[in-house]
């Protein structure tokens, strides 16, 4: 039973990420576009958030709330830039939506890989970049509700983004 609970909680946490991207794609399709570049836009936003969190904490910042706020703003800005690139290419230049979207997916993955390796090198080349203060703000749970046994673990053991 414990492995089922762990599987279910992981599915909810990782499914939320896919849900955010799918919601954006649904809104795009309501506007008449097929944006296959959603994963690339998500990569760009994620690496922007990681970089802002990394440099905030490296500069001596210790407030989890400020680190979380900066990383969220950077994610939004990075994703907006990715969306603007797609919009400029498909609307202004009338490029093929399928080709542009797939190119943006490849581009976003490459950008995230390049800057992720650069940040990893700056952090000592350990392969994992830690944002201890910022990640504690994202993982904050409601203490009373998350301790309600199986029910609390299934429904209240996630951060505020889920």
What is each of the regions a protein language model found here?
Residues 61-111:
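Alpha-helical transmembrane segments within multi-pass membrane transporters and channels
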